Amino acid sequence: MGGVKKMVKNKKILYLPIILTLSIGFIFPISAHAKTYKKDDQIVIKNPAYTKEFQERERKIKRKAQEIKEKNTTYKLKTYARQGDKDFTDLIPDTATSIIFTDETKPNNEDVIDVDDNGDGGVVAWLEDSGKVMKVSTQKKGQKIEISNCMYLFSGKKNLESIDLTMLDTKDATEMDGMFEGCENLKTIDLSPLNTDSVENMSGMFEKCKSLTELDVSYLNTSKVTNMFTMFSECEGLKSLDVSGFDTSKVEDMTYMFSSCKSLSELDLSSFDTSNVTDMSGLVSYCSALKSINLSGFNTEKVETMESLFEGCKNLETIDISSFNTKNVADMYSMFSGCEKLKKLDLSNIDFQKVTDDSDMFESCDSLAELKVGSTFKQNSDCYLLLDVAYTWKNSKGEELPYSTYKFPENVADTYTKVPIRQTNAE
């Protein structure tokens, strides 16, 4: 051992070949075919085949290490903020008008935005076009960005005009409530890349997407969804909406689902399975352009609240609710309030036995001239229809209701028609 130290101390020996040889000795046994000799006090490997073998093994080791690294790398987008950190929504700058989920490589001259879930660099983001375009990528060809919770993902980003979801993997997501809520300038969105097989909550998903004029929701699997509260509420620009493919068999809450969709002129909900719905408050309230609505398939046996169901639908002339079962409904507050053009209404099948609040039920239904009711019809408060001093109401026998009466007769099945006071005086 001392001789080796002395030799190293006294001889001019190149260290690299020695290190290489020692490394080879430890990692790979030197091949029997590899010959070495000294030249000018340097150790030389004579057999070139050995160096090629070493280099190939070294490459394999590096490849294996890279494979292990990639295997352990996750490609998951951060959602909820960790302590002292920001979530993805917070990292979307106000300058961004477009977000693109992609697999392309980040340009070297662009700064990295940390959007990775666990900080291993599997997902990166950067800005282009002076901050107008935000790209989010795994930088691995074909590798999608995984996300397990889409709740409020783009919420409140008023300047976004387009979102490309092509490389976003949502197969594990159970929450999409408020996903696009408040994207007031969003003009187009392709939902075909979304996997919603596991989603249970879509409440407020498109709420206040005021600039959307069309929306194809045929790609959405809603078979597990239980909550559709305000799902399309205040989508003021939507001119049409086809929801015929929706599986609503598990939905319990449809409160204000289409409320204030002010450009919708017709809505067909006949395919909806509402057998588990308990709350329909404001379902189509303030759909002010709505002229036609189909509710023929509705099963309302479990519904307890129909408050403001049709309120503010000022262009509806007819409403067919003959399929409704209201045996469990307690709240009908403002149910038809503001239906200014409604001329006839058949409530003969409506069960009023459990209704405790019917106030303002017919408020501002100024065109209503015929009302048909069943044997359980009653009112807990004064009826707006009977407050107009210019008109009176007659029953099917032609008998006028007393002038001082502000309620229709209780528990009497009948059809009432409105006539001007001057007509009755002339008679």
What residues fall within each predicted segment?
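Short, Lys/Arg-enriched N-terminal segments with co-localized hydrophobic residues
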Residues: M1-K6
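Sec-dependent N-terminal signal peptides of Gram-positive bacterial secreted proteins and lipoproteins
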Residues: V8-H33
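Negatively charged
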Residues: I30-E427
